[in-house]
Amino acid sequence: VRPLLLLHPFPQTANKCLTPVYYGRYLGFDKAPHMWGGWAEYVYVDLEMLPGTKIYKLPDDMSLRLGALSEPLTSCIRAFNRASRAGGFSWGDTVVIQGSGPIGILAVAAAREMGAGRVICVGAPEEPRLKLAREFGAEATVNIQEIKSPQERIARVREIVGGFGADLVMDCSGHPTAGPEGIEMLRDGGTYVEMGQFTDAGSIETSWHRICTKDLNVLGSWGFTGNDLPLGVDMLYRTRDKYPWLKMQTIYPFTEEGVAQAVKDAMAMKTVKSTIVPWPELVE
């Protein structure tokens, strides 16, 4: 759990500044009293130390397990809203999602709920990730373990999409090679949204000439603001029976062995979302 606790010392906050970086704070367990978040039954929040902190109550009939998906889903919703405000995402658009991890699959669902006409997911492996992406609404998937050449993947996406390319491509993988590949999947005048680089994966080598010649919009999206979070909670609640949300999660106990196995399986892409629970009742 990485709670984004929003402060309000700047006028940009009240004015709904679109960039949360300047006044958002991530809190780790290194700061006293060491109970800011993580795999715990309770979280300590000092409202005097962190004035303006927003706390949202989940609906009474929403499980904590389902509610745990609100944070990553909200990030996806905000990324599409960013594109929409910039004129790069409209009802009926064709969307390509790069990445089939938890963010990628949640982005597939968000794209569907926010009006995308067609959604294609590029990622791996087939089991459990690409199969689940299709269950969440991806019309087609492209397996990068089977189609290993970037040029072949670009050609395959264009074959599926037809015409001149996708209206919007969103990177949810965070891999440095995704950007150069993704912009070639776009139609001229399309929009590329980078939301996968939430850790520094290094420099991305691409020709900016292609961005110019294709007349592209390129946007970055970082996390979400406190005003965005209710959108994620609301979508989960409204569609709780529409999408197989809980199939994303593989449950592990909060033990030394359980945590180690959860991380190991996630790194090996054997799970979509390794979920560590502090007490068994959470999964009932």
Regions found by a protein language model. Name each.
Residues T94, G190-T191, N217:
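Short glycine-centered segments of the SAM/dcSAM-binding site in methyltransferase folds
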Residues H34-W39, P59-S84, V95-L106:
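A glycine-rich, Thr/Ser-enriched phosphate-binding loop motif common to dinucleotide/cofactor-binding enzymes
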Residues T94-S100, R112-E181:
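Adenosine-nucleotide cofactor-binding segment
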Residues V1-I55:
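Glycine-rich phosphate/adenylate-binding loop and adjacent beta-alpha elements
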Residues R156, P180-E184, T225-E284:
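C-terminal hydrophobic helical "lid"/dimerization subdomain
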Residues G196-D215, G232-D234:
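Rossmann-fold NAD(P)-binding glycine/threonine-rich loop
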